[in-house]
Amino acid sequence: MNCPIFLWRIYKYIVHLFTGRSEIERICYNIELKSLDRLALIETSVDYSKQLVHIKKDMKSEFDPGDVAIKIVEIKGFNQELLAFDSIILPNLISALEPISLFQGLKKSIEKKQKIPYDNNNLEHEASLERLWEALLPDVRRSARLSKEWGTLGFQGMDPATDFRGMGILGLDNLIYFSTQHSEDAREILKNSNSKCCYPFAITGINITALVLNLIDKPHFKIYFFKNGSTLTQFNELYSLVFISFDRFYQSKKPKSIMEFNTIKKEFETKISQNSDLVQLLRN
């Protein structure tokens, strides 16, 4: 919002006085608005509304769009006569709230995965780790489960389990998705990471998971999910896009040694944290 909040509230009051409708009611009534624009305007209106403080709190986690829509109608005092005969206001409000609820549900699922630690005694975890190896190095067989050969994939020690402490099983899931669904890109990046100006593929991938998590509430990240769907698959797709973009960015800097890695990584983080078209930003 480009103007001070108090000026915005004065503006809303004057418009409400002349139209007899609240801001959200006007947004929902405007049939010329695109769905994403309506969603963004309603989200902003809720954020800056003194009356909807509890609604804002409810919308910080997964919620029932229909229930929240009814509460907004009651709190904001929508014109009940118009509401009774108008078939677009309430449906438009509910449809704008649905993507927000789905996004919060996705965040909950992601956080749940992040909190699951890698367990060497969990057969599913061990099988997933083997799947990662096979996806990236299908023609290479390791000498043992605990081996320095894991360093080829960019893990720090003989047991990759220790590298997943911060991101849990989510970090492994992201690496597997990228390595299986974008195998050509993943193998090319692995090759790049083992070149003269190398960086650890797996550790970098886990850092990319942390980066996407840290930025997920940025407006342009949220818009990505609102457009494409708030699913784990789309989270994995975004992760893959960020990883590919990072490698291109890193290679374009032509680093002379691995000592430049952290500086380049910070530059990249600054770049994608900007409020802009995320997909276009990553493809440039």
From Swiss-Prot:
Boundaries of every ELMO domain copy: 124-276
Any Pfam family matching the protein: ELMO_CED12
GO molecular function terms noted in the UniProt entry: GTPase activator activity
Coiled-coil parts of chain: none
PANTHER family: ENGULFMENT AND CELL MOTILITY, LD01482P
Protein name as catalogued: ELMO domain-containing protein B
Species assigned in the record: Dictyostelium discoideum (Social amoeba)
High-level lineage: Eukaryota, Amoebozoa, Evosea, Eumycetozoa, Dictyostelia
Gene: elmoB
